């Protein structure tokens, strides 16, 4: 679970959205409908295991580019200091 919510398939996400819309059409506020559907999902998926993978490749490339750009700026500041 990520932030207390299980990982859902596309179909499960669509069903949840449809359920939220149905509850709202029946007069429930959006916040209450979302909270109710979220609770139903939590109860249905209680005990599920979710694997989370992070893709940090883009962050690493951006970090590698920055030091070169900043190195020139830093050296100019040092001369004027």
From Swiss-Prot:
Residues 54-63, 70-81 have a biased composition (Acidic residues). It comes from the Bacteria. Coiled coil: none annotated. Residues 43-81 are annotated as: Disordered. InterPro entries: UPF0181. Belongs to the UPF0181 family. This is UPF0181 protein Spro_2806.
